[in-house]
């Protein structure tokens, strides 16, 4: 199972991310393979998984250089854009779930994440994630940045459905509609809704 999955990852990385330096592509594949094999996403655990015939010190340096590379953030966005384009093939509607969540217990940081899925997929694949201070939870500017990025990456003609949990407000849904996309949103108890031209009613 892991061998087959690694081949899929390698095929995607080498086929879609050819502009990324070859050495980093190889290390990307090795690191992703290590995580898929059950190793924790930490510098020391990844280094142990990548030791091979070398020393742990050398493996630590490799992983540290990858994590500390100033280009890795931009290259991660390139990878997410390529993944999104891959998911858009076949003409099926693309469902994108957007939500805010805590990065870790304690609530110091929060993450705005978008996960894409289509018919036949077991679970969504993360295509966008950005970390903010907890004070930015629900921030409208951060949410606009997400939509702007996804729209820039999205191939023309794709039917998109955005799904959100409670907490997203009317301006968000208006922005989604302006992009020509559909949306589904969960609302909290006590919220009133209205079809255009009708009276407000409690949902």
Tell me what each language-model feature is.
Residues 71-74, 104-108, 171:
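Short active-site-adjacent helix-start/loop capping segments
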Residues 4-8, 12-92, 148-149:
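Electropositive nucleic-acid engagement tracts
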Residues 129-203:
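An internal, acidic/charged active-site-proximal segment
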Residues 80-86, 113-115, 172:
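Intrinsically disordered, low-complexity boundary segments flanking structured domains
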Residues 56-58, 62, 91-154:
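RNase H-like nuclease fold core
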Residues 1:
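Extended, highly charged
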């Amino acid at each position: 199972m892991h061998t087959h999955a690694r081949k899929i990852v390698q095929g995607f990385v080498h086929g879609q991310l050819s502009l990324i330096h070859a050495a980093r592509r190889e290390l990307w594949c090795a690191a992703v393979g290590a995580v898929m094999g059950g190793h924790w996403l930490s510098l020391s655990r990844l280094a142990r998984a990548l030791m091979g015939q070398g020393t742990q010190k050398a493996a630590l340096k490799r992983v540290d250089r990858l994590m500390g590379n100033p280009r890795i953030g931009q290259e991660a966005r390139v990878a997410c854009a390529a993944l999104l384009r891959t998911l858009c093939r076949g003409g099926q509607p693309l469902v994108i779930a957007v939500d805010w969540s805590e990065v870790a217990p304690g609530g110091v940081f929060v993450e705005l994440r978008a996960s894409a899925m289509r018919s036949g997929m077991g679970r969504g694949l993360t295509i966008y994630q950005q970390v903010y201070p907890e004070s930015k939870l629900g921030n409208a500017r951060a949410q606009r940045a997400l939509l702007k990025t996804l729209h820039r990456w999205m191939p023309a003609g794709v039917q998109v459905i955005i799904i959100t949990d409670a907490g997203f407000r009317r301006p968000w849904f208006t922005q989604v509609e302006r992009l020509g996309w559909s949306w589904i949103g969960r609302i909290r108890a006590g919220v009133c809704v209205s079809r255009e031209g009708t009276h407000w009613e409690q949902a």
